């Protein structure tokens, strides 16, 4: 979609060499907006994905920090939320959403495909 392409262009402009946005369309989620922020290590961003029912997931990208601490692929649950994370092309990434929501679980399965 045009909106997804616009979010990708915005991300490419702000994060040279970063991986492309995760394709979560097979789970019904499309990127709809993004926010740029800063960390001690440099620019970071959050991209919001939404499905046709209005459910949302958040995608985060940030630099790894001074020690260049890259993450192995993994997941972590905290209360009602689950984060699935990985590293690539010099950045750390995460997708965060409701842990027990079937739509979010379908998105997690889509993430397991090569990114």
State where each predicted segment sits.
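Polar, acidic low-complexity tracts enriched in Ser/Thr/Gln/Glu with frequent Gly/Pro and Thr-Pro motifs
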Residues: 1-115
């Amino acid at each position: 979609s045009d909106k997804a392409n616009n979010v990708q262009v915005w991300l490419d402009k702000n994060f040279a060499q970063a991986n492309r946005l995760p394709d979560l369309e097979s789970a019904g989620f499309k990127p709809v907006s993004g926010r740029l922020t800063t960390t001690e290590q440099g620019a970071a961003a959050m991209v919001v994905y939404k499905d046709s029912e209005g459910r949302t997931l958040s995608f985060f990208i940030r630099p790894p920090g001074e020690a260049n601490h890259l993450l192995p692929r993994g997941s972590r649950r905290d209360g009602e939320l689950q984060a699935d994370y990985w590293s690539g092309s010099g950045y750390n990434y995460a997708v965060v959403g409701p842990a027990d929501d079937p739509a979010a679980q379908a998105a997690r399965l889509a993430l397991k495909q090569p990114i």
